[in-house]
C-alpha cells in the first residue's frame, strides 16, 4: 500500500508563512504525524507533492525520513488547482499496491486512518457527519446507502450528507481512473480541484 499526500498549496485561509503541513500541533508537525501514522499502519511508500516554499518542506522531509520511505514530487505550478498536484504525481500511481490519497493539512486521530486502511471495501472515503454546511466544505451526499453526489456544489436530493475529510482509499484500477479523469479535466481547466475528478467519476457511477 502507498500513500500520496497533497501538500503543495498556499494556506490562504490560515495565513501561514510556511506550507500548511509544517504547522505544529503540540510538539509535532502535521508532516511528522502523517509519517509516523502511515508507517505504523503498514504503508510502504509515501509520496508528498510539494510546491509553496518547497525548500522548507523538503528540508523537513529529509530530516524525518530516516527510513527513506518518502518520494518528493515537485509541483512548480502550485498556485493553480489541486488537480495539477495530483497529475504531477502521475509516476507515483505506478508504485505497487492500493492508494491512500490525503490532503496534507488535516489533523486527525490515528484511529480513523486505521479504519480507512483496514476496511475490506476497495474504494472508499472518510466523512464527517458533524459539520457546518456552506460553500467551502466538500460535501458527500448519500442516497440508498450509496454516494450520490460529491463536491462543494451538490444536488439537494439525498438521504444524509457529510463533509469529506480529504482521505480516500482507491484500488489500483480506481486510482488510474482518477488519474486519467484528472488529466482530461486539467486540459480544459488547470484551476480545477482534484475533487472535481472524483465528482465526475461518481456521477458516471464508475466507483464509490
Please describe what each predicted stretch is:
Residues 1-16:
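N-terminal nucleotide-binding beta1-loop-alpha1 segment
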Residues 2, 28-98, 188:
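Conserved N-terminal catalytic core of the sugar/cofactor nucleotidyltransferase
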Residues 96-107:
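Short beta-strand-to-loop acidic/aromatic patch adjacent to the donor-nucleotide binding site
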Residues 199-208:
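Catalytic donor-sugar/metal-binding loop of nucleotide-sugar-dependent glycosyltransferases
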Residues 109-187:
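Conserved core of the sugar-phosphate nucleotidyltransferase
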Residues 7, 50, 103, 127-128:
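Short beta-strand/turn micro-motifs composed of small residues
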Residues 186-194:
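Short, charged, surface-exposed loops that flank catalytic or proteolytic processing sites
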Amino acid at each position: 500500500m502507498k500513500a500520496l499526500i497533497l501538500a503543495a498549496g498556499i494556506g490562504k485561509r490560515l495565513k501561514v508563512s510556511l506550507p500548511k503541513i509544517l504547522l505544529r500541533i503540540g510538539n509535532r508537525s502535521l508532516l511528522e504525524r502523517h509519517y509516523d501514522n502511515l508507517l505504523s499502519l503498514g504503508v510502504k511508500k509515501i509520496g508528498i507533492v510539494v510546491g509553496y516554499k518547497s525548500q522548507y518542506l523538503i528540508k523537513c522531509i529529509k530530516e524525518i525520513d530516516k527510513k527513506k520511505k518518502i518520494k518528493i514530487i515537485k509541483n512548480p505550478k502550485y498556485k493553480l488547482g489541486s488537480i495539477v498536484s495530483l497529475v504531477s504525481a502521475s509516476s507515483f500511481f505506478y508504485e505497487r499496491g492500493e492508494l491512500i490519497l490525503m490532503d496534507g493539512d488535516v489533523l486527525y486521530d490515528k484511529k480513523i486512518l486505521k479504519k480507512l486502511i483496514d476496511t475490506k471495501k476497495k474504494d472508499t472515503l472518510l466523512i464527517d457527519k458533524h459539520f457546518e454546511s456552506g460553500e467551502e466544505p466538500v460535501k458527500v451526499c448519500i442516497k440508498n446507502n450509496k454516494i450520490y453526489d460529491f463536491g462543494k456544489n451538490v444536488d439537494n436530493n439525498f438521504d444524509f450528507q457529510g463533509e469529506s475529510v480529504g482521505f480516500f482509499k482507491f484500488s489500483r484500477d480506481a486510482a488510474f481512473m482518477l488519474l486519467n479523469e484528472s488529466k482530461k479535466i486539467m486540459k480544459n481547466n488547470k484551476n480545477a480541484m482534484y475533487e472535481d475528478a472524483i465528482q465526475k467519476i461518481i456521477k458516471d457511477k464508475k466507483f464509490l
